[in-house]
Each structure stands twice: as structure tokens, then as C-alpha cells.
């Protein structure tokens, strides 16, 4: 098949044909204003897609009241994560073969359509559908943002910009619940979704007018061959496997017993479908969603391992720390967000500093090692919180945890850009993005199971007269309002035990992230690298 040059409909600055200092392919000489404008726009886009994970949490009570849909609560969150995970790798293929700009704008359009559907829907089913559509688009936003930065900024300067994009996850995770609560109380829960529309419009405008992709050789498959290039057989096995896994983790131990046929079948299907997916990837070779030569690269699988463990640990803490503040310290949704600021400030500041360190010294390995060690210490200390722990403890422990996350969160993306040829960077970026998203989705569910089961067990030991279902349905912020004074201490101790047991998941993951750092090669981002795009013909 002939190769054609991917051109951009907008005028481009004249690029230099010489490699930049980092050894990457030539790119347009973007000026400071262009880089700053694009960075702000992309940060807003990542902020919105990250905000959608947490902003709905404080709006759910009002939504279920309006739709009388208590049974649908789990789907409001999982539907977004499911489709997000399911499309991340597929977007890697799109970014490989087609214009980064237009694939990104298409993903953003899908996300915006989903947000609009969520805002205007008159039914609970419509809300779930809107969340699914938004998740489809979200699967291509973060990886697309990283690729736009990669095509605008030289390799040795990218760590800072990559860190800025990654810090949006932390900011959104803390801002989501109080912002959702404020919008729900003062306007309507529908504005939790409408808020994405103007922000998305700004992002789209900036990307449309300021991003001029470098001249690059990309093979654009004919429409009739597009399906084979997108690995439909692999997707046929992979997408249901992810759905089965997340459903099993969400339902197991809560809605259904772990020994129930439904959960067992879901786990068995997950295993069978994943094995079939692996077989298809080996057979498809270069046309696979995950080409074996990329997955077998030790830097890629070790970075993916680091990403899934670090993000899994981080999501456990950002999900359950607000619950600890609301239940144990009687904080409102807004105040719990403020009490979470030590960790988020640490993540944001240290993410930027870590990017500078990699830029200055050229190596990400020491930063990732420090990340694993610091996160493990901070996670371990957070798991020791008691009902009478003072502010010095929960502030200090959060800072340590945030330092660990900030140091390591964006380094896997630098690994991808440093060790893979430019033609493989979209696929490698999608692999890391998928690992991060899947880590959050899986281990939030694992933490939820541990929390609910441990709370029921501990509550039975502390005070068998307390109705566990009633306490959980009452919510963390109303415990003191509805519980008799004599039952409150036992309930608080049970809450504390259950939450810190969930924190053990984060401790284990933080410790396991060390495996990824040990397996990485030491390769400087300042040295020239192989930038020849691979032939994706698969022949």
C-alpha cells in the first residue's frame, strides 16, 4: 500500500529538518505563546475528563431522588470508566494512522455530546447512556493531549509539560466532590455535566487554531481496510473481557456473593476472553491492537506495571480519604475537599518539580525509585490513622503520599517517548493511559469491596444491634444526625477500621510499584534516539 503524507488543512510554520536536542523528529518551531495556549487548553480538557469521575459523587443523592433510581447508583460511575478503558487502546490505533489534531477533536466531540446527553436526559437510563458516550470520548483525550505536547515541544523539555497535564488528575479528584455539591445545591445536578460544554469549546478552539502538527509520514488505510487495521477480532475479545472484569469486581461481595454463579462466570469469562485476545495479538502481529514487539519491550511492560500500581494506589486514597474526613472528622463535602489539599498540593507541585529534575539530569529512573519509596511510606502511615488522629498526622501523611504520586505519575509517558520510535509512540502512550485508567477502575472496586465487607464484620463485633445497611445508606455526612449517641463511637471505630483496611490495598500497590522501577533500562532523554517511524504494514 502506498504511503501518503498527512497534511493539516491549516497553515503551518516551516519546520526544520534537523532533529531537536532530544533526538526526536522535526516539528514546527512553536513559539512561546502557542505552547502556553495549547498547554492551558489541554490542561482544561484533561481536567474535565478527570472531573467527570468524582464530580458526580456528591450529586448522586439528588439524582436518585429525582429518578427514583437507587439501584442504578453503581452504573453512574462504572459506565464512564468502562467505556473509557474500552476505547483507550483503540484510540492509540487512530492516533497512529490519522491526524492527531482531528482524532483529538473527535474524541473531545464525543465527550461533549455525552456530557450534553447527561445534562438534558429525563431518565436514569439516559444518564447512563450519556456517561457511556462521554467515556468513549474520554478514552482518547489524555493520550491525545500527550501526543500534541510531544509534537509541539522537544523531548528534553517535555517532562514539565507532561507533569502539568498529569497534575490535572489530582486537582480534579479533590475539586470534584465539593464542586459537584455546590452546583447541585445552588443550581442543579445537571450543571455537573453542563460545565464541560464551555470548557470543551475553549479547548477545541485553541487546539483547532494553535496546534499545527509536524509534517509526518503516516499510512492512512483505505476505508475498506480500516476495520482490519483496527483489529476488530482483538477488540471483540478485549472489550467484553474488561467489562466482565470490572462488573465482577463491582458486584462481588456487595450485590452478589463472591461464590455466586454470576460472579464466578464473570471471572471465568474474563480469563477466557483475555487468553483469546492474547492469541489474536500474536497472530495479528503488526496489525494487532498491542503489537507484540511493543509489549515485549521491557521498558513498556515495566512502565505499564508502574502506572497501574501507582495509579491504583492513588485512586484508593483519593476516593477514601474524603470518606474518612466526613465520617470520622464530621467534615462536609466541601470541607473534606479542603482537608484533602495537602495531598493535592504535593502532587501538583512535585509533578512539576519532577519534570524539571528529569529535564536537568536526563534520567527518570531515580525519580521513579524515589516515587515508589515515598509513596510506600506515605501509604503505610495513612493506614495507621485512628479516630483520634490529629491534624498533624493526616496532613503530614498526605504530604508524603502526594510526594510519591507527584514524583512518579507522569514518568511512564516519558519512558514511552524516550524508548519507542515516533511511529510507535501513540500505541505506547495508549498502553500507559489504559494501565492508569484500569488501575483506578479495578482498585477502587477492590477497595469498595474491602470497605463494605470489613465494615459489616467490624460493626457486628462492635455492636450487633446496629443495622449496617441503614448506616451505609444514611451516608457519611449524616451519621451524627440519625444515630443514637450511644451507638456513634462503635460506628466510628468500624468506619475507621474499614477505611484503613481499604488503605492496605494502596500500601500493597505502592510497594509493588518498585518492580517496575527495577526493570527499567537507564536511558537519558538528552541522548539521540531512534526516531524512524515503523512500517505498520505488518508484512
Swiss-Prot record:
The chain crosses the membrane at residues 36-56, 108-128, 133-153, 160-180, 191-211, 233-253, 262-282, 305-325, 338-360, 362-384, 395-415, 502-522. The keyword Membrane applies. The keyword Transmembrane helix applies. GO terms for molecular function: transmembrane transporter activity. The indole alkaloid meleagrin was shown to be a good candidate to control c-Met-dependent breast cancer proliferation, migration and invasion. Residues 1-25 are annotated as: Disordered. Gene3D superfamilies: MFS general substrate transporter like domains (1.20.1250.20), Multidrug resistance protein D (1.20.1720.10). It is found in: Membrane. PROSITE patterns: MFS, SUGAR_TRANSPORT_2. Its main location: membrane. Keywords: Membrane, Transmembrane, Transmembrane helix. Disruption phenotype: Does not affect the biosynthesis of roquefortine C and meleagrin. It is a multi-pass membrane protein. Belongs to the major facilitator superfamily. TCR/Tet family. This is Efflux pump roqT.
